[in-house]
């Protein structure tokens, strides 16, 4: 998937000036307009391929579907709650964020919240401003020796752990992705959730808002917690069930909470905010000069690197694309798309299961990015729903009635060589199998249904190819085919054949353009098809 035609970027929220400068220095045109209504945003996006936002702009399905040229949405920050990911993915719009840009600021705010909870600093400050001097009311607790439960051990969770360990806190945590060994390497004991609840004096959450994390702290889990537990949420509103938290505060099960985020922002229900044991901020996790500068810089660099084909980072809705930018993988992406296009032309809108098989050590983990490229080739001509690309391929293939499986086999000795890297695309239960490889940076077709091409056939983007199977002993076949090309006004640019397989030979002709019809050809050969990717 190329982004070379991405030329104009709209920045619709306030960002550090470095963002605009980096984009412009990278050759991109930039428009900055803030506080746009939905209608105004749609109007501005009509001639923009890229959009960069913070949290204020709502990139809804209506906006995405109405922005015909939109290719990429960049979120200068971590959370993408304000972007409709499903709509973006369906439209084939890439969504990126800056996962590390505000990590330090969010971690520092979390640590500040923990200290404020322990010593009731905001409440004591408010009391002093009211002219009071009440030392007994604000009795606190030391952090030293207390147990901190960290739910989510990504960058922010790790930074929090390091800082609070310096206060003498014991850190335990939970993360379904991070292994116990990795967690132990930064001083966190990984435990199942049911063991964390009764163990912790303080709990802080640092997970994304997902169906599996919504209401992670609820009536049931609060009941399992140590009485007097204190809770911090500087991640996403909704991870802590706000109703359950209020009930736990009212009963004394929870001694205090520090909230930087809410299910609804700003919160209309003031019960939590007004509770005397709640510290709250208006979503300030990334509100530092350093974080804003870092996020603006990172998202701009990501856009420029993407357009120049250097790298792709921070991808939210198509992680497989990240591999597509490596020099080794790029030509294999082209091969996969070519074989998918070939399979569609050959099998005629196939149904059932498409098998994508990689072979060779260097392709061991490549299936995740090659299978979407195969799908692009399969569906590009058939799909009437949207432009098929590496972002939406897996979503659209299911709707097309196809199942795509990916597997890997090691390189084996044989005619292809020892350990040679190959890509096979086949239709399960049907006589359609194509095998390709990459020579240098050029995708090559090596085999069709066991018929080997020596040398291999170059598969070049934009080069029409006609493939047909016929008996090798027919002396008039080739002159007849050339005559049919002449009648259609199509030039023959290249020609080669496979070895004989099952009594037939595959012939491949490079053409100046695709033929308007293959009906005349099919009268003279066993089968024929043409394609161009």
From Swiss-Prot:
The keyword S-adenosyl-L-methionine does not apply. Keywords: Acetylation, Amino-acid biosynthesis, Isopeptide bond, NAD, Oxidoreductase, Phosphoprotein, Serine biosynthesis, Ubl conjugation. The modification Phosphoserine is found at residue 14. The modification N-acetylalanine is found at residue 2. The keyword Lyase does not apply. It catalyses: (2R)-3-phosphoglycerate + NAD(+) = 3-phosphooxypyruvate + NADH + H(+). The modification Phosphothreonine is found at residue 78. Pathway: Amino-acid biosynthesis; L-serine biosynthesis; L-serine from 3-phospho-D-glycerate: step 1/3. Its EC number is 1.1.1.95. One of its GO terms (molecular function) is NAD binding. Gene3D superfamilies: D-3-phosphoglycerate dehydrogenase, domain 3, NAD(P)-binding Rossmann-like Domain. There is a cross-link at residue 21 (Glycyl lysine isopeptide (Lys-Gly) (interchain with G-Cter in SUMO1)). NAD(+) binds at residues 78, 155-156, 175, 207, 234-236, 260, 283-286. The active site is at 236, 265, 283 (proton donor). SUPFAM superfamilies: Formate/glycerate dehydrogenase catalytic domain-like (SSF52283), NAD(P)-binding Rossmann-fold domains (SSF51735), Serine metabolism enzymes domain (SSF143548). There is a cross-link at residue 21 (Glycyl lysine isopeptide (Lys-Gly) (interchain with G-Cter in SUMO2)). The modification N6-acetyllysine is found at residues 21, 58. It comes from the Eukaryota. GO terms for biological process: G1 to G0 transition; gamma-aminobutyric acid metabolic process; glial cell development; glutamine metabolic process; glycine metabolic process; L-serine biosynthetic process; L-serine metabolic process; neural tube development. Pfam families: 2-Hacid_dh, 2-Hacid_dh_C, PGDH_inter. Liver, kidney, brain, testis. Homotetramer. Belongs to the D-isomer specific 2-hydroxyacid dehydrogenase family. Catalyzes the reversible oxidation of 3-phospho-D-glycerate to 3-phosphonooxypyruvate, the first step of the phosphorylated L-serine biosynthesis pathway. Does not catalyze the reversible oxidation of 2-hydroxyglutarate to 2-oxoglutarate and the reversible oxidation of (S)-malate to oxaloacetate. This is D-3-phosphoglycerate dehydrogenase. It comes from Rattus norvegicus (Rat). The gene is Phgdh.
């Amino acid at each position: 998937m190329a982004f070379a035609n991405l030329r104009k970027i709209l920045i619709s929220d306030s960002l550090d000036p470095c963002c605009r400068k980096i984009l412009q220095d990278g050759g991109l045109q930039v428009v900055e307009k803030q506080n746009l209504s939905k209608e105004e945003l749609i109007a501005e996006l009509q001639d923009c391929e890229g959009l960069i936002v913070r949290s204020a702009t709502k990139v809804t399905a209506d906006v995405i579907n109405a922005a015909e040229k939109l290719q990429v949405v960049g979120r200068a920050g971590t959370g993408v709650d304000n972007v409709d990911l499903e709509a973006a993915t369906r439209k084939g719009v890439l969504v990126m964020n800056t996962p590390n840009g505000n990590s330090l600021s969010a971690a520092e705010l979390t640590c500040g919240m923990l200290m404020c909870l322990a010593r009731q600093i905001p409440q004591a400050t408010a009391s002093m401003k009211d002219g009071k001097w009440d030392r007994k009311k604000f009795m606190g607790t030391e952090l030293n020796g207390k147990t901190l439960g960290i739910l989510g051990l990504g960058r922010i969770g790790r930074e929090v752990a390091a800082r609070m360990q310096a206060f003498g806190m014991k850190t335990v945590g939970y993360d379904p992705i991070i292994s116990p060994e990795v967690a132990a390497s930064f001083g966190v004991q990984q435990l199942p959730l049911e063991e964390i609840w009764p163990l912790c004096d303080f709990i802080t959450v640092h997970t994304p808002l997902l169906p599996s994390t919504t209401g992670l702290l609820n009536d049931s889990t609060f009941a399992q917690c140590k009485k007097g537990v204190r809770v911090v949420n500087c991640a996403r509103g909704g991870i802590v069930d706000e109703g359950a938290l209020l009930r736990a505060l009212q009963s004394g099960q929870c001694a205090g909470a520090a909230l930087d985020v809410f299910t609804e922002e700003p919160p209309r229900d003031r019960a939590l905010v007004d509770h005397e044991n709640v510290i709250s901020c208006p979503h300030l996790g990334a509100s530092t000069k350093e974080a804003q500068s870092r996020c603006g810089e990172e998202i701009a660099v990501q856009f420029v690197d993407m357009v120049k084909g250097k790298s792709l980072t921070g991808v939210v809705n198509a992680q497989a694309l990240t591999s597509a930018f490596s020099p080794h993988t790029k030509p294999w992406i082209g091969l996969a798309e070519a074989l998918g296009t070939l399979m569609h032309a050959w099998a005629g809108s196939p149904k059932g299961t498409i098998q994508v098989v990689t072979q060779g050590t260097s392709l061991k983990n490549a299936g995740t990015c090659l299978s979407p490229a195969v799908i692009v080739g399969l569906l590009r001509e058939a799909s009437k729903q949207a432009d098929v690309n590496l972002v939406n391929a897996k979503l659209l293939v299911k709707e097309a009635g196809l199942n795509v499986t990916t597997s890997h086999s090691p390189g084996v000795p044989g005619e292809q060589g020892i350990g040679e890297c190959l890509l096979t695309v086949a239709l399960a239960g049907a006589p359609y199998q194509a095998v390709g490889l990459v020579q240098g940076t050029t995708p090559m077709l090596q085999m069709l249904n066991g018929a080997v091409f020596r040398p291999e056939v170059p598969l070049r983007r934009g080069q029409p190819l006609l493939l047909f199977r016929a008996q090798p002993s027919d002396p008039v076949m080739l002159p007849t085919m050339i005559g049919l090309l002449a009648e259609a006004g199509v030039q023959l640019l290249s020609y080669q054949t496979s070895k004989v397989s099952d009594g037939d030979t595959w012939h491949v002709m490079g053409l100046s353009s695709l033929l308007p019809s293959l009906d005349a050809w099919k009268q003279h050969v066993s089968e024929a098809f043409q394609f161009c990717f």
